[in-house]
């Protein structure tokens, strides 16, 4: 992508010389998770079997960012098939501690943004792949509402769960990027027509903030606990809330089933044996185990998902924002499987 980046940057310079600006992203370099198609540029999904894969056209998000003047600096490393931070090139390192990984699967996007290698990056999330590396690398990740950002031209892992969002170094930047990549796309059948509205004059006086006490227990870090104190010191009225007692973790079987269906050919051909990560919890084993789920299991999981969606809707009838560690308790599963932003 080096030649492409220079060509796009030169094009932005020429427009600038003519006093033409394409907007706030004019000339800003960004990194793109290597799940998104880039015409005639390798998009390997971090996985050995897909090396040398050359897409015929750009993903929708690439087109939108180019139209806004952003410069594609490079593709960022992704955990193989959107899981973990291990790919065919090794493990994506954490810029703050090179002995640690960046978490995944938007590992390279978070690592590169944290290291200042790009102005922002694009990531995806099925279950924690924006929020986890952002927490790990100290970036600000935004996982938008399901369907808000087009996935056209992006590797499909789980049709009912995959989401696309920005990884930046501050909150304001995530809003700016979302305003550009947001919007309906007829080529993504799950796309929704949700306008982006931001009122800088709106006060926070009436903002209702909730938290789940159980997620701030003994295993929670002091930094997480400090958040409650900071929010309270800012004058907000914190409300303790509870989420319905449901077997949330069971929904992960839906993720495994959809992912196994997406890569059934990989499993049946035994090419998943070439993936670098072969642990018990890695994709090759998960794909195979998912084939033992019955039709009855799927019906029951769909019923459970409906109950989780209803529980989340009921929760947000009383609050506007829920704060807490995203990976403690049921919220990582509940919010992803109900399509809520984070």
What are these regions (language model features)?
Residues 27, 33, 67, 71-75, ...:
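Glycine-rich, small-residue loops and helix-cap segments
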